[in-house]
Amino acid sequence: MTRKENEESESLSSSSSPIDNSNNNNNNNNHSIFNPIGHIQNAFNNIDLNPLNVDFKGHTDKVVNFFQHGTGDLNDRMQGVVSKLRSNEYRKKMHSVLTKIKDTKEYKSTSNTDYDVIFESVDMYSNLQQDPTMDKDEIDVVTDLSSYKKKFTHWLGKERISTLLFIPTLGILIALMGILCDFLLMELGTLRDFVTSRHNSHVIPTDGTTPTPNSSIADKYDLVEGIVFVGYSVFFALISVCCISFISPYAVGSGIPEMKSIMSGINLSRVLGFKTLVSKIVGMVCASAAGLTIGRTGPFMHASAIISQMLMNLKVFGAIKKNQIVRYQMLICALTSGVVANFGAPIGGLLFAIEVTATTAVMGNLWKGFLCATTTAIIFFLSRSTFSKGNFHSVYEFEFVPKEYGVADLITFVGIGIITGLIGAFFVFIYEKLVRFRLRYPILKQSRIILVLVVSLFSAIITYSAGPLCRVSLPTAMKQFLGQNEPKPFLFEQDQTPYYKYLNLLVFIVVKLILTAFNIVLPIPGGAITPFIVTGAALGRLFGEILKDHFDSQAIEPAGFAAIASAGLVSGTIRNISPSIFVLELTGQLSLLVPILICSITSTAVGNFFNRPLFDTALKIQGLPFLSNYRSSKVYTMTAKQVMKKNINYLSMTSTVIEMKNFLDTFKYTFIPIVDSKENMLLVGIVERSSMIYMLDIHIENIEQKIDEFKSKYFVNNNNNNNNNNNNNNNNNNNNNNNNNNNNNNNNNNNNNNNNNNNNNSNNSENLEIENTGAILNTNSNNNNSDEEDYDRKDNDKISLIKPNQDESSSNSNGGSSSDFEEILNTQNTNINKNDNEDLIKEIEDENSSLGEKPIIEHDDEDDDEEEGDGIPLVSMKDQQPVLRNRHTTTTTTTTTTTPITENIYVNDAFEISINDLKNGGQSVWGKHILGDIIHSGETALLMDLAPSQVPDLTPLNKVFHLFTMLGLGFTYVTSLGKLVGVITKNSLMEQDL
């Protein structure tokens, strides 16, 4: 084969290869049709995901550049203002300003706003609410080693040292309060036993011995004893309600709902007052002595918080009150000690105080609560030996040998939790209905005394009728349920039938639950924790007796079930796990930890399934603001944009002083949002109200001072010049008169010639500038009448200007035109009248003619015609700025000097006052100054937070709730790409039905 043939064959093979490849591809495509996954992929590949050809990369870069550098028109001055706010020098000025304004009414309103006036949320994490001296924990080094007194004083002035002194003092005072209440209750219990001593055998003796039960039910009741019992209860209930009606109505109830609201950031000043403390203690003691089914835990916690607030009002601990964060920590310590003074459980008391009242808790501050609780517990246990004979015992011990738990026992614990959870939910439902029923009718709402008398009467009758076990105090009944023996005395004798044992406990449970629901609704001081603990113990004892008799349960004794159900019923009502801890401390049985926790968790879950907790329900009914942790499913579908307030009032960096003053007069906001400009609406920060008021006052004072200095300096010099000119004019007039007389005596012809020459000169001279008051006077005799009319029309306040042309001068005299400098002198009266002006003009004319001086106004030789009085002025008033011309006259020569008036008055680097702005007063000067320039001038500091709390407008509402609860926020701003679009306050979230 030749070379040419080979090339042809290669070309044919190469031309046929594409056909073969295409056939192979077709075969592959035929096989791919039956592959659904590949078909779907090919379908998505054909979709145009960017039909509008949007440059996403460029858009992303634009958004990133927006957040990093702001908008394109954000000028350099704004950046300079922000950098100045962040400088250390400006922060030092902020500290000095804060020390000046912290005693003002506006600044105190940021933390002392009364709830009765307005709901004002306190942002306890905002740096504007803290005293800068409280932020430093380290003690500054004192170089002078000899000043030990100064060093010790500085050391004591720190927040940490004052806290260490405050906490033990608080714990001791609360423990003493608990001891006093125990002593009063013991004495009142003894008095009650004494007045009912006719059948005292039915009451459990205080010496611990077991009474002998009577043989029949009828022997357990006596008419006289019943009347005395009921009268005793009604009398002390009357004293309790009188404390509310006549001392302080804020002591009503347990006080825990109010403390929850206070710990949320709401200021309730009267709730923590001294009158409330007296009413709370006296009312609680009397209500407990009356035999009403109420508890002491809530009132103790409320009273402890009041003691803490009163201690912080002392000058020694004044630094603690200034810092909101430390103040809330001390309130938590007080609430903890209140629980310890009631139950003697420091660990459970701290957890209970945090879980019940606080929305958030800083774990690093728990040591403060433990320190206060330990101090109270030490005094509490030391005092128990003294008051061991009383009816009230805060610690209940029983003998229990732990055994192994089986699956059946665990199921039993869960079953008890379910039952206690259902009972707790039903109790909350009944409580809400009773409170709303009372509030529905005005007669029940207003007649406190009558309502308490009626309810206490029926409560005493029911309590006495329910048997001896229901008549004893709650702590004594708790000791009976946790004991190894049967609860005594009985309403029904056990020897008649074994079911009477269950019936006794069932009667106690039903009676106490009903009485608790009715008694805690009354307007008296009283809580519900202790009745739940005792009733739960009775319920657990009933379960334990049934399991022991019918199912031969040996793992846990009936007393153990009493402790388990006690924690379960409390958790099912208030929906907290912490009661399980202090129940363990009450009983001293840590072996029951797992059963109690199982029961408490189950009870809490069951109760939450039906309704809100007891204290949250009370908050909702009372209308107290509080962010509850129990919210509906709406918060997961809504955004911040749907709940924000859109019509927000703000100021910008370009706002003038007038606008800022009007804003402060119109709105009483504690914090004011600041944006860069009304067009961009970029949030720069927030400003404290009192700081802005202080800044405006300082700025206005500085500007007014500069204006007064300028006016006083100028007018003094001007008056001196006027006096000198007048004296010189008088001397010149005298000299001219003498010269004229001599000339008349010597040569009459020459005198006549001189007079003619003087007249010609006066007629030919068109204009003459006189530097007496900085104005130009008309010397033409033909215009004297017009000048007089001009003076009369302007009341000698303004002087007309002279133009080169006679017609122009006359028109100006009629028009009353004056220079800007003359406008400044409107308030000053000139000392020159018309006659003085005429004499001065003649004197100058004679002087110029006699001395042979050239006239001030130069004339052209060609235009020296009487009909054409066109002259070229030496100084053109149209082209030059106003000048101050001072004339110094002597006997031989007259010299004229010109001193230019400065265009602006220098104030500082940011402001220069224009002469034109002075004619309308100081407000026309400082009223136009803007906020950015005032900050840049550095006259005084502005308390400004450059990083306020803000959330995007599409943030889920659930996250917004978490931010408010975890950070303790009072408000947060809503932004869209950095622009301020709205605000969300804590009150607005509280008002939402979520």
UniProtKB/Swiss-Prot annotation:
CDD domains for the chain: ClC_1_like (cd03683)
The protein, known as: Chloride channel protein E
Record's compositionally biased regions (Low complexity): 11-32, 717-764, 809-822
Region spans: Disordered: 1-33, 715-767, 802-822, 846-872
Protein localization: Membrane
Short name of any one Pfam family annotated for the protein: Voltage_CLC
InterPro entries registered for this protein in UniProt: CBS_dom (IPR000644), CBS_dom_sf (IPR046342), Cl-channel_core (IPR014743), Cl_channel_volt-gated (IPR050970), ClC (IPR001807)
Residue ranges of domain CBS in the record: 644-705, 944-994
Main location: membrane
Biased composition (Acidic residues): 859-870
A GO term from the CC aspect: chloride channel complex
